[in-house]
Amino acid sequence: MGKIIGIDLGTTNSCVAIMDGGKARVIENSEGDRTTPSIVAYTKDGEVLVGASAKRQAVTNPKNTFYAVKRLIGRKFTDGEVQKDISHVPYGILAHDNGDAWVQTSDSKRMAPQEISARVLEKMKKTAEDFLGEKVTEAVITVPAYFNDSQRQATKDAGRIAGLDVKRIINEPTAAALAYGLDKNGGDRKIAVYDLGGGTFDVSIIEIAEVDGEKQFEVLATNGDTFLGGEDFDNRVIEYLVDEFNKDQGIDLRKDPLALQRLKDAAERAKIELSTSQQTEVNLPYVTADASGPKHLNIKLTRAKLEALVEDLVKKSIEPCRTALNDAGLRASDINEVILVGGQTRMPKVQQAVADFFGKEPRKDVNPDEAVAVGAAIQGGVLAGDVKDVLLLDVTPLSLGIETMGGVFTKIIEKNTTIPTKASQTFSTAEDNQSAVTVHVLQGEREQARFNKSLAKFDLSGIEPAPRGMPQVEVSFDIDANGILHVSAKDKKTNKEQKVEIKAGSGLSDEEIQRMVADAEANREEDKKFQELVQTRNQADGLIHATRTAITEHGSKVGGDVIGKVEAALADLETAMKGDDKAQIEARSKTLEEAGQSLYAAAAAAEQGGNADAASGNAQASKAADDVVDAEFTEVKDDKKA
């Protein structure tokens, strides 16, 4: 059995971890970072960028760069939260045929948020595979505790599109509790996990206990807001900067996607800087232009101003904490430890609000960016049998039930019920001789059915004619360990039964998922071909450089016909490199290589010829020297007198 990896699929950043030698280990991605931006971009060349590379080009390609899609996953286009998001993102959000919120590129290509999330999951999968040196097919993926059934299903679908068998979906705060509590001793204790991430907020009250030598993590209650997070804090800063610039220059930057993307980056940086300093400056030269010329944005932002801008958002996160405590039957003083998770919890104002509410300082020894992935990896280890003596008891975050006569929501499973769980209730017909009943499955807390989330509708037919109130129809709900619901309705008299796994009404059909899986596989093949083409181009480029160097060094030693062949092969290869035909580049590289070898051979021969001439000259000089006869000279005296 291969490794089951743990993935924190975040709104802003994602992270992957594995169990390694009995301990959870966060894996660095190909850029050497422990977290990866949850950003996917489509370039004009058809390349798909994921992570840091997508983030780097966002300013110049705003309409094709998708971020924070986790806030759209499993949602209807008409949802108030989705409508609110439309004005804050530069890319297109539109309604799919089934009413889902989908995204759209500048050339009108439509994609489900699940497809975008699948790209991020693929990157996490590849990161793990590169580290392990083996194929990875199984994963535990985390979701916000307050995700409903539709959002959980959609996350599973994203995993499937990415080529992953999602063994378990677990709640982010629960995963963080696992990461924190696995190696901690000190008896039973109750902890609060406050998780304020990039796009969602959750709070869970969890009891960690030793039961018969087994460490048990039991979620007592959970609450949250799936549309509250760091993105909202960023948007407050963006709104402030836009308003200030409008006052100063009379130009509304909301209408400029390029300027908005630059503002988003600047707002996020400013927010982060103000966690450690009291003041920062947002400086964006050439942010826009009008008839009078270019305009520059330069605005000072203090920590006090930032805190004033987001004060209501911080307060909004405290109410779910109060509800979760009440649901758990506890007071703030009963909580032993408070754990902070999610990047937004680095903000001093947030930390202070949490400390004030719970009456104790939150712990700082848990990495808010990595704890969730670590917990997911631990759960993966539990499922694989690598981690022993750990029991995780999670809960369903929202009540589940059906619509009954008069539009009433009748709960069958109450919120904060430990999962997996089953529950049944018997209902009857509303009219005489009714031969079928429609079961409308809902999720939520409102008394009126229409205000809750509709999950599915199905019919149980073949009921024998009888006066109203006589037939008995048993409706059973079964929630699995992933928090995903299965519903059945049975006529007790005839034993006719209708079962349905809730495929969220806002989810993808099997056909759509299969198409997306095929598309993802095709893209993986395309990406592989692209990498091979780049490698071939790089090798060809190196060959061209080496050949030009050889011409410079040896060109004067060889004949013009040899140089002519090399120059022609060079030109052919350079032409081929302007295209995308890998085979042609390889063929012309081979031709140039052969021409280059001819050049080296000719140069070597020329050098040998030169050496031979030199050797011949030396030989003749030697022979002349050999003809000289050694003799002794004596002075001859001439006695003749002139």
UniProtKB/Swiss-Prot annotation:
GO terms for cellular component: cytosol. The modification Phosphothreonine is found at T200. Residues 603-627 are annotated as: Disordered. It comes from the Bacteria. Residues 603-623 have a biased composition (Low complexity). GO terms for molecular function: ATP binding; ATP hydrolysis activity; ATP-dependent protein folding chaperone; heat shock protein binding; protein folding chaperone; unfolded protein binding. Induction: By stress conditions e.g. heat shock. Pfam families: HSP70. Coiled coil: none annotated. GO terms for biological process: chaperone cofactor-dependent protein refolding; protein refolding. This is Chaperone protein DnaK. It comes from Xanthomonas campestris pv. campestris (strain ATCC 33913 / DSM 3586 / NCPPB 528 / LMG 568 / P 25).
